Amino acid sequence: MNAPVSRMPVPFMGPPILVDKKANFAIAEMPAIILYLGETLDLMPATAALRATTMKIVNDANDVIDEITLDGGRAMWTKKRWQDFTPRLKKWMSLWEETGRRHGLKTASGFLLGGGTPGIADVVTATLWSTMTDRFQKIEAILEETAPMTAALTRRIADLPTLAKLAAKAQQDYGNAYCGGQIEASLRRVLGA
């Protein structure tokens, strides 16, 4: 990040960055990384409409992360700020719930965009919500109440062996940290976590 732009594997301001040494390719920005991984790992849907919807889910997840971290800590959480934000968080959750409903998602079965196997939209959904709900019980309760099918999908996908292994590695490397620093401390304070 501190290197001159001319020496960076790809021009970027900050993480995340993905370097695919096999392909001699680097890319920054979460949505671009997800698109690259989805394409190279053959996890993107077959139709243009479902690929576009997948990228909408990816960008929505990125927006939720920006909002829950108050744009990376431009401000800190207060009880009032959290109370004002909670209806918006519920609306975000309802977007996932309605998307899943429109594609046949049920509490015990199905995937966010339909189909017979999980795709990028499911992995991003599970990663977003499980990372948050594993650390903040109040957010978990809101998700369960507001978007029960999304909560169930999140658990099913997060329990897949590869994602469970990744979550265990993250727990080992980072403990119960969510976003770190003062912003996480303020979030934990307002949520009593």
What residue spans do the PLM features occupy?
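Short, hydrophobic secondary-structure boundary micro-motifs
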Residues: 44-46, 108-114, 141, 164-169
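Polar helix-capping/helix-linker motif
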Residues: 2-5, 160-163, 180
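Active-site-flanking alpha-helical
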Residues: 38, 128-129, 167
